[in-house]
């Protein structure tokens, strides 16, 4: 008779070891008995995916880890050391890059689990993985809202720039404090808990337990970590778009009355171009946040309030991947759209082939000086 497990391998959970068809196994087949208790029963009834799926996701996360580390590392390096970029507004960009970098720091846990086909690192590393994900995900969303607020003030109220370094730092601290309860509560199991999900290679808050507390937690965290920042982002950028269109319309009408082609001077055009490019970068990043986190939010709502049978391991890994992908893309959006960042990137890394004309952002440079003088005075 064949033994249930090899002496050199962890003991298998007998009821999860095989589906009865000989070749098929359930998720959790290679999890030690003392770790099974941490896995929601929903996943233990799902079939184990092919090993190739684990390996493919592991390779994909290696790519994300490398791209995000390099991209966000460069953003943090350049924004924190460049005098022209050291402005109160860019404190939010720096904070977003820090959250995105933190997001990618949990990738090695996922990669290790993937190449070991499951819950290999156990519950302790699962708690670390989920804590990092909660901090970075919620923090990125609220920072995007703060960026929207700042862009809203800069573009719609150009004569009332009241953002100072002190205010920016305080807002960033508030963002970190805002994230803390959503990490501490499930981490201490005071309200909900962190558990494995999908292929058991990643972890998040429990959205599958069929009880009132879990449903209340899912609904609450969905509102405060996704709905609130999304509504703020939509409001600020809708105001920006409305202001830009109405401003352009007013200028065209006035120019028509005066029989001139345009009322803008070259300096005004340059300044407007720089501001609009920065706004476009911010809008793009906020759009990416919405697109990448919406699937995960919908998935958690289905788990708590809907038909759990829809949540197959493969289906849940897609939202888990999309919300990590945005942390990789954010820095490259700035590399494409942020004029002063592109100029610094061109100076420090000429081999990247970035082509940014300093004349196009001269007004932005003077704006930076003005902001710094206002900050010093404050």
Curated annotation (Swiss-Prot):
Transmembrane domains' residue ranges: 54-78, 91-111, 128-148, 168-192, 217-244, 281-304, 313-337
* Source lineage: Eukaryota, Metazoa, Ecdysozoa, Arthropoda, Hexapoda
Q: By its UniProt entry, which InterPro entries does this protein fall under?
A: GPCR_opsins, GPCR_Rhodpsn, GPCR_Rhodpsn_7TM, Opsin, Retinal_BS
The name this protein goes by in its record: Opsin Rh4
Function in brief = Visual pigments are the light-absorbing molecules that mediate vision. They consist of an apoprotein, opsin, covalently linked to cis-retinal.
Disulfide pairings: 126-203
Annotated membrane topology: Multi-pass membrane protein
Q: Which residue stretches are annotated as topological domain Cytoplasmic?
A: 79-90, 149-167, 245-280, 338-378
Query: What the entry says about post-translational processing?
Result: Phosphorylated on some or all of the serine and threonine residues present in the C-terminal region.
Q: Name one GO cellular component term.
A: plasma membrane
């Amino acid at each position: 008779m064949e033994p249930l497990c090899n002496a050199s391998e962890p003991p298998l959970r007998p009821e999860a070891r095989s589906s009865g068809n000989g070749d098929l196994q359930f998720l959790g087949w290679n999890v030690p008995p003392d770790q099974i208790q941490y896995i929601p029963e929903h996943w233990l009834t799902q079939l184990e995916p092919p090993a190739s799926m684990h390996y493919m996701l592991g390779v994909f996360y290696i790519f994300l880890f490398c791209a995000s580390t390099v991209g966000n590392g460069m953003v943090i390096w350049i924004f924190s050391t460049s005098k022209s970029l050291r402005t109160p507004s860019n404190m939010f960009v720096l904070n977003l890059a820090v959250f995105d970098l933190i997001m990618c720091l949990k990738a090695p846990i996922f990669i290790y689990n993937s190449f070991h086909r499951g819950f290999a690192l156990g519950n302790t590393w699962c708690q670390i993985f989920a804590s990092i994900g909660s901090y970075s995900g919620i923090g990125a969303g609220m920072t995007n809202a703060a960026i929207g607020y700042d862009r809203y003030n800069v573009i719609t109220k150009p004569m009332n720039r009241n953002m100072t370094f002190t205010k920016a730092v305080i807002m960033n601290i508030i963002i970190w404090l805002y994230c803390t309860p959503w990490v501490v509560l499930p981490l201490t199991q005071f309200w909900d808990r962190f558990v494995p999900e999908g292929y058991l290679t990643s972890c998040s808050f429990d959205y599958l337990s069929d009880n009132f507390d879990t449903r209340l937690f899912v609904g609450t965290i969905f509102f405060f970590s996704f709905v609130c920042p999304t509504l703020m982002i939509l409001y600020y950028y809708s105001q920006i778009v409305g202001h830009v269109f109405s401003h352009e319309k007013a200028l065209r009408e006035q120019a028509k009355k005066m029989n001139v082609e345009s009322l803008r001077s070259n300096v005004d055009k340059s300044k407007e171009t720089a501001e609009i490019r920065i706004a476009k970068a911010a809008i793009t990043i906020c759009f990416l946040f919405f697109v990448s986190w919406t699937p995960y939010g919908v998935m958690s709502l289905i788990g708590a309030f809907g038909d759990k049978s829809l949540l197959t391991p493969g289906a849940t890994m897609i939202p888990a991947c999309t919300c990590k992908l945005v942390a990789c893309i954010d820095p490259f959006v700035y590399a494409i759209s942020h004029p002063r960042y592109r100029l610094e990137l061109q100076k420090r890394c000429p081999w990247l082939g970035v082509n940014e004309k300093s004349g196009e952002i001269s007004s932005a440079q003077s704006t930076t000086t003005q902001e710094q003088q206002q900050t010093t005075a404050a």
